[in-house]
Each structure stands twice: as structure tokens, then as C-alpha cells.
Amino acid sequence: MPGARLVASHILNFGESSTVKNPTSIRLSRISLALAMALGSNVVLAQSTTGSIFGQAPAAEGETVQARSSSGVTREVTVGSDGRYTVGSLPLGTYTVSLVQGGKVVDTRSDITLRVGSGTEVSFAAASGATTSLGAVTVSANSLPAIDVSSVDARTVITSQQLAQLPLARSAEAIALLAPGVVPGYSGFTSGTTGTSLVSFSGSSVTENAYYLNGFNTTDPLSGFGGISLPYGAIDQQEILSGGYGAAYGRSDGGVISQSGKRGTDEWHFGAQVQWTPAFARGTSPNSYYVSGANDGEIYRRYSQNKSWETTESAYVGGPLIKDKLFFFAAVEGDKRSGNSLGAVTSSYNTQYQYSNPKWYTKVDWNINDNNILELTGASTKTSYKGNLYNYDYDTKQTGDLNSFDTSTKNSAQVSIAKYTSYITDDITLTALYGKQKMTYFSQTPGYDPSLTYINGSEFENPAITGGNSIVNAQTVLTADNPNHRATSNNLRLDLSWKLGDHTITAGIDNLNSHDIDDGQTGNAWIYAFGDPSTPISDSPFVAAPNTGAGGETGYYVSKYLYSTSASVRVKQRAQYIEDSWQVDDRWLVKIGLRNDQFTNYNPNGDAYLRMTKPQWAPRVGFSWDVHGDSSLKVYANAGRYYLAMPASVALRAAAGSLYTNQYYTYTGIDANGNPTGLTPLASATGGAVSANNEYGQSPDAKTVASSSIRSEYQDEYLLGFTQQINADYVWGMKGQVRKLRNILDDICDTGTIAAKAQALGYDIDPTTLNGCYLSNPGRANTYRIVNPAGGYYSVDVTKEDFGMPHAKRSYYGLETFLEHPFDGVWQAKIDYVYSKSYGDSEGQVRSDIGQSDVSATVDWDFGKVMENSNGLLSNDRKHQLKIYGSWQVAPEWMLSGNIALLSGTPKTCLGYYGADESNPVGYGSYYHYCGGVASAPGAAGRQPWQHIVSLSAEYRPVWADKKLGFNVMVYNLLNESVATSTYALYGNSKALNTNYDRINYFSTPRYVRFGINYDF
């Protein structure tokens, strides 16, 4: 469906600074490491907040290994007859691991830090003490295992120590950009609750990712736009899974962002931080100009007078309430941003705005006993905005009097999680997690005047009437949200892990429910437009040419736009999985998993309109081969299928009865408020308002909303790679990744073809009673139910050939290579390069080139003619990605860090009217894959420019303050390069070129400097 919502321009914003801490270095034997990683079998659930410890010890009768954390967790397991042991499902933290023989500790390893989702090797030999040496080779526990031969996926884990060293923005998405294959998404797509910019994983759309917080799914239940994340200082570790993840994960065919929060220990710690980005240290993007049509060369939007400043204040405290038993951690963060933003010349206001983004996080850990742990988590994030609109004169560059108040928003999300872990035996672990998420979405416009109609497209007002100066009014609201809108979700997980010899079997259930309450929008506007005077505005539904009405002789016309959606809907998702981690021998590890997902979406009446509950088997298979048996070279591979659920918001336009109409007129005048006068209605198929998608407000029968043969969207993925230890200091590797989208779910609106097929079958139907659009599997044959006037339903099979549509496809190919030097107490760095290609005829659930956020209800697949020439480079294609980041401890008191991203530009699209004659056969205007009458596939219009983002930071921690006090400065985008990331894609036609075509919509973030002071005790 053509996008109905207008969005204001924003600036893509990734990149902030951090503080520095020095990890303690513990030396372990590399040979011992290799043995244990080759022989140890350990499984950690991908979305869990746990890790494991495994290794080798000299076999002795009654020998055990004891692991004790800084938060009092103690586990003791028996060493097997082969000398192997595994301590699984351990809460993250720092551990002391001891070898016990005859009831006495004979050897100990201290300061062992776990990584989420990973195994940490700790091996023992006959020697005692904190260091074991075999030959002349020793290794550091903090930098190794450099090669994890127990993993088969594409995983990046960023720890709190790294976050304290690297110049990064304070968001989950900015951290995720460190991972290979993860790139910024379309700048206009932001998280509905937090407002942060979103990311794309390996060619997938930004709505196909999953977010987790302490094991709980916090993905936006309404549309999949982002998820809830922690205060930056409360993040212990962030796990980024970009491919190959196990059966415990689902509902994602993009990537996974999983955050684990900090917890209290047996020592009290507290700290605070203040960061400040002043206006004088922030650059501005270049001004945006028209580059086409009648306004070519004129300014569109001025950025040079925009100013903003930001402050972030945060604090934390954590420690024992009862030593070794009960622990507490809490963190708060307050971010405030103020400034001004000039609107476009068509809406020339200077908006003085304020943002406020408070967050908090608490965690309580109760070690009931050595075998049972209870964890309670609470978290909250809020985002509020308010602004005043002042008149602005683009000619004089002066700001005038207050015009009106901008729409203010207050969004919030609160999360509550309880997790129980029971170590039933040394080999059996049960985990139960239950969490709730409550969200509110409030907006209002102070002084809103409903008597004023929003004016859209004022640049297309007839200059013979206006004299070339746009006429608008004080109305700034196109669509108004329901102020009572709220949502809830809950997630129940049960996971059981059982070690049976060389096999570790993990199985569980993953149930997620969400409820979208009082969601909806209403809007109306006058939309001015310009076209060929003698060409019908639309062929289907028919709207006559402009020159058939008074005042339309030169091609100028206007439409009265009405839009309304309103609903309360819910979604039920269920899943079951099982996975076997099989240590075949000392070099081969095989992981075999199977997941089954079921998805059901309900309309406002509680009737299921999408019921995909038949088995949706998602196999996951992978292996790891320790080639030499010493962990110096790993070859691994993975293959899997991933299903994607439909979020709640799909029901608003598909199943709840939406109104989306335009009534067309010519006009002979425009009043002082921008309203057209002297209106002459243009002839239309309905005699009045028309809807290209038959959205006239009727509520569809739930059984007819979707194809009866519909299946979920799913993707197949394949990984093949290797990682090699070059020497004691460097690791390099390569990885190939292939993704194939096998099935998509979107709406098809070609009801004429469905009606014709039904009539050809002899069915007696009234075409005007059909739904506006049907949820379908485009590119495949679909079966539709049509209401039988006598009762019951007709069943109509329609093929993709009937619709004139191509086969649906999205393919991604990526080749990655990297070189890494782990932190050795002095410096660390990683260089990562990805060469990739993403192409096909469907980006996914949303469409970036036109900024359309209607999930699975985009322009794509509505009609066969809008899919002609649609196969090309997709919007998230980045041919080249080079990422370099690292830190250097220049002196005991000084740390320098850098983060560099060199990214090739995304493809550009040119969309125009249909065919060589530039007609409009299905009423979609300039949304066909033709440009000036010539076929134009995605990417045929070229690419956006490269982005070269160089960010540096420095921190000073003086010895006189015992290094507890830190002063830091960070410069984001040192080169101050601000380039186009998105341009306007609608060409219009050769006789009436759209003057907006190819003008810049969004720029990359210009340079800014951030200063900080922090204290950690």
C-alpha cells in the first residue's frame, strides 16, 4: 500500500565515548587450553545470561572441581574418568576455580571472567599456584580462548570493559555495529519506544531482529522496530548474533541483540558519570537543495542554523545485602537533549525542542543454596518530546514569533523478569524464566485546532494562483494518535539441559503473548499535486485527467485525503525446541537442533485472522573441526532455517477495517489557510472518494483476511568459515555467509484478478464486497476465501502468473575476513572487512527506499505491475564494509581508543509512472519501477556516497585519585564528513517531473565532541 504517513527528517546518530578499566591478566597453558576445548562439551543457551567453565584435570579418585563466583555462587562437579569436567549454566561474573582432591584444594585459578553464551576453559596440571606452564607457552585468561572450537555460529560479544574503552554511542544498536555484516538501517526507521536508529543484519530488514534483556524477549511487539535496552553503564555484556544461532532462538531472520545486565557482588561498588555534548562542539549537515524540476537549485532545508546540546547523567550502586547469599545492583541514567531544528521550506518553522530519556535498572540475586538461584530484574525506559514552532523566513534567515506547539509525546516501557535456575544434578540443569513488559504511547498537540486542515505538497500549488510562494496554515498535525494507546507482552521460557556422556541435550519451550490496546491514527489533509493535464490521474480505480475540470488545464489538482485506523488486537506465539551438542571425538563437535514455531494473530473481535499453527520445522545443524587438535585452526559450518512471526500492528490495516481514501478536484483559488477554492470534482470510478486498496473502513471477515494456504516468512542460511591462530598474539579468519529468503508474507491488493478468477470458476460474487487487500505469500500460488452470498465461502486458487508477479526472492552473499589482537594489558585491535551483495525483489517487511514502515503491508506485491523490473540491489546492500576498532594504554594514566567505519553507499532507486507511455494502470502514481518511461530496477539509479566515520577518544585516570576518577573526551566523526544516506526516489513522469526527485532526505551524523567525568569506587 502506498505510504500514508509523513515523517520529519532526522539525522543518523551512532557513536559516543566511554571509560577505561584494565582487566587483570591471568596466565594459562595454551596446550591445556587446546585439550580442554577439544574435549570439553558445554552448551549455553544463546539468549541466556549464563556461561560455562570446562577443562581438563589429572584424573584421580574422588576428584572434583569447585567454581565460586564473586557473588557467592558455588558449584562443585566431579571430574570424569577421562579427566574432563564441565560446570554449565553459570551466572556471569568473576570466578575462582579450584581443583579438589581428597577434600583438599590442591590447585586454584583466580579471576576467571565468563562470557555470555560461551565456554571458558580452565585446566589443571600437576603443578600448583596461579600459573601452569607446559613448555615455554603461556596465555592470558582475559585474551583467550582466542579460538573457541566449541562454537558453530557467528557471534560477537562486547564486554563492559570494552564498552569502557571504545568510542561508541550509548545504544544497543551502536554496539551491534561493531559486529561484521551489521550496518545502519534507513535513517527514518527508529525504535518506537526508545527513538534509537535501527540496524540491518546481513541484508535483512530492520524489523527482522530480536532483542533480549537478561534472557527476556523485549522486541517491540507492535511492529518489530527495535527493543528495550539497558542504561549504558548497567550493561555487563552484549551478545550480537549475526548468523548460525541455535534452536533456542527464533522469531528472527535478521540478527539477535542480547544484553546481560550487571549484578551485585560480595563487595560494595558505586559510581557516577556526567557527559556533556555542547552546542559549540557539534557540527551541522550541509543544506539540502532541490535538484530536479521547477525548483532545481533552490534550497529545500537549511541545516546550517541547527544547534543542539546534550547531557547524560548516570549512577550505579551494587553489593551484598547478605554476604554470599543476597545481592543487589541498581543503575539510573538521565539523558536530556535540547536544540532547534529548521523545517523544510514547505513547512518553514524553527522548532525549539526538548528530549528527555530517563532509564533505570535493578537486579536482585538470591543464592538460595548451592543448587538453586533466583534472579529478579526490573528495568524501565522513557522517552518524552516537546517543542515550540516559531515562524521562520527562508529569505531573511530570521526566526519570528511563536506559531504553534508541536505534538508532544511520552512513551515508556517497563520490564519485570523472574528467573529460577536449579542444578538438579551435576548433569541436569533446569531454568525457568517469566517476564512482563508494559508500554504506553501518549501524544497530544497543545492548542490543536481541528478546524484547520493539514496542507501537504504545498510546493505543487499552482504558481499562477500563489505567485510561486507556498500557502499553508498553522496546522502541523497530519495524523493524530490515540492518546490511550498502550501494549503489553509476556514471555515464558522453560529450558532443561541434560549431559549424557558425549551428548548434551537441551530442550525447552518459548511462549510469547502480546496485546496491542487502543492503537490507531486518524488524519485528513489537502494534498496538492501536479501531472500531465491530459492523462487520467488513475486508471484503476479510475480518476479523470486534470484538464477535465476547471482550473486543471495546466495539470494542477488537489485531493482530500482521509485516513483512519483503530483497534485492540493480540498475538500468541508458541515454540518448542531440542538441541544436541555431540562431542564426536577430541576434534569434532556436532550440533543438531530442531525448533517448531506456531503463530496466531487475532483481530479486534478476538477471531484469528492468521493461524500458522501447523508444524513449522526449523532445523539447525553445525559442526566445529579442531583441525590440528590444539585449537590453532578451527573450521566450522552451519545451516539452518529461521521463521519470522507477524507483529501486532499488521492487524490495523489488514484485519481491523481501515479508511484510506482520496477524493480528487481541480481548483481555481487558494485561501489564506491553504485550502483550495473553486473546487470541481473529477470523475471517478465511485463518483467520489477512491481507495487504491479498497480501504473504505469496512471490517473484513477474519476468515477472509489472509490466504487460507498462507505460511510464515522464513529464511535459510548457510555459514562456512575458519579461524586460525597466527602466533601468540594474533588471530585471523574468514567466513562465507549465504542467506536465501524462501517465503515472504505481504499483502496483495489486486482484487480484480481474484474476482475474475472466481467468476471464471462460475462463482456468483460481487467484486465490490471483496477485501481491499489480502495477506498472502507473494510469488506463490495462494488460495482465497470469498464470502458466499448463500452462506459459507468460495475457495479461489490464484497463481503468481495470474497476478503477473515474479517469484519472491531476497539473496545475501557475504565474505568476511578479520585480523585481531586481543587486549594484552597494553593494546587491542580488530580489523574486519566484509564484501557482500544483497539483491532480489523484496527487502522484507518494510521498504527503505521510500521510507515505508507499514510492516508486511508495503507497496511491494500489491499489484503485478508494481513488481515489474523489481529485481535488483536491495536497500540494505553495502558492497564494502571495513571496520577497525581498538584501544591503546599509552601510559598507566592514559588510554586512547579509536573506532573507524568505512562503508560503501546504499543503492538508489528511481520510481516513476508505468511503461514507456508513463501511464497509471493501478492508481499507484509514481511507484512503478520505471524512470522517465524506461525500466529501472532497484539500484539502477546509482549509489549513495561512501561513509568514512573516524571516531577517537582519550581518557585520563590520575594515580593521585587511585584511578577511580576519570576525565574523558570523545570526537565522533573526526573528519566531519556528513554525506547523503537517503534521497527521494519518486521521479514523477517526463511531462511533470517531481521536483523532489533525488533531493537528499537524510545525512550521516556530522562531527561532535563529548566531554565526560566519571567516578568509580
What is each residue range found by the language model?
Residues 103-127, 135-263, 297-301, 310, ...:
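Periplasmic N-terminal accessory/gating domains of Gram-negative outer-membrane beta-barrel systems
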Residues 585, 589, 599, 729, ...:
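Gram-negative outer-membrane beta-barrel transporters
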Residues 469, 604, 611-618, 622-803, ...:
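Solvent-exposed loop/turn elements at secondary-structure boundaries
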Residues 269, 303-387, 408-431, 619:
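Transmembrane beta-barrel wall of Gram-negative outer-membrane proteins
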